[in-house]
Amino acid sequence: WCDGSYLEDQDKFRMSGIFRDVYILKRPKQAISDYHIKTRIEDMLAKVEIEMKFYFPLNVKISIEDRNGAVVALGSIAEEGTAVLEIASPELWNTENPYLYKLILETENEVIVDHIALRKIEIKDQVIYLNGQKIKFRGVNRHDSDPVTGFTISLEQLTTDLTLMKQHNFNAIRSSHYPNAPFFYEMCDKYGFMVIDEADIEAHGPFMIYRKEDTDYNRFKRWNEKIADDPVWEEAIVDRVKLMVERDKNRFCIVMWSMGNESAYGCNFEKALEWTKNFDPDRITQYESARYRNYDETYDYSNLDVYSRMYPALSEIQEYLDKDGSKPLLLVEYCHSMGNGPGDFEDYFQMIQDNDKMCGGFVWEWCDHAIAHGTAENGKTIYAYGGDHGEEIHDGNFCMDGLVYPDRTVH
């Protein structure tokens, strides 16, 4: 436990250890320290802007190849700044045709190979467009979870997940509720998924403890006081958002930045959103928990692009649409149930399809969370979950709520 534990109260198993690869990379002193790729689509021309930072001055040769290996753009840069390359008649990336170009950055001492997707995400008249086409997020929330390896996820398991999602017509994933391993985004670029990248911030537990004697109304009204609206937490909250955005800025599957989950709203999230929009104005921002704040105070929502909700009734959705709200409406979570699925699926789907300002939703959630505990007499795997390890405090079967079993067998 540490002070960071207050910001990591996601609904999942609690496990200890190092879950992802850790490595040391030795590089020459004369090297690229960072690069930031931005793209501009103008009719039949794409401009690729690559902002570079160096440890020491050096010459960089830049080339872009199409998927057949043909060079479509060349450039160079000899000092920190931005190189601009142009691609004529570009192939645009989308979820049905996730076309990727190869980027090669060559210096005297090393070669860096990355990929680029050409796509444009924007909001016009409360409707979200990808490459000028109205889109619907047919999304799902995905946790890192394996019945044998826990939070450690292999490329093979992720490939299984993404393949199953494609087979069942999902086109979007929310990284609930923390940034995933870097290869997750590379695979989403390749497979064609739009991603909501979410910061590792969730703090609904502390407010339940500090306000446990309050009425539900007062708890939600003052939820934000301890963390979201206390400047003591500004550095921690903004830092987590910055680390996510800085690390993942060159992954084009990411169309939306999420400030976190279920942590209420206040001055610290205002700062995080302000930094994010200044750094990356081309992507959309969302934060469902922005609606939980001190009702006696006024807050800045100008850097939030989407009005997002969890589990609203159909009547609430219709009320927002009738009032002609100023932002697109997104269901970041819906259709949550343990055991058999909940009803009203068709009604929600129909409402999403019938209203351009309702840009889609993300089903909660992808997989059941459980730990493999050997084999039963009938040959089936025994899966243990809340309470099966003798713990006094647990959530029962609350995390057995996925569309697939822990081993990814479809329900």
Model-identified regions with their sequence ranges:
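Secreted/periplasmic carbohydrate-active enzymes, especially glycoside hydrolases
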Residues: 1-195, 240, 255-256, 272-282, ...
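Substrate-binding clefts and catalytic carboxylate motifs of secreted carbohydrate-active enzymes
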Residues: 10-18, 24, 29, 238-239, ...
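Aromatic- and acidic-residue-enriched carbohydrate-binding clefts of CAZyme catalytic domains
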Residues: 138-143, 151, 198-235, 241-245, ...
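Hydrophobic faces of well-ordered beta-strands that scaffold small-molecule active sites
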Residues: 138-140, 173-175, 195-197, 255, ...
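Active-site beta-loop-alpha junctions enriched in small/polar residues
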Residues: 142, 178, 200-202, 260-262, ...
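Acidic-and-aromatic substrate-binding clefts and catalytic sites of carbohydrate-active enzymes
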Residues: 173-182, 262-267, 293-295, 315, ...
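Active-site neighborhood of glycoside hydrolase catalytic domains
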Residues: 190, 225-326
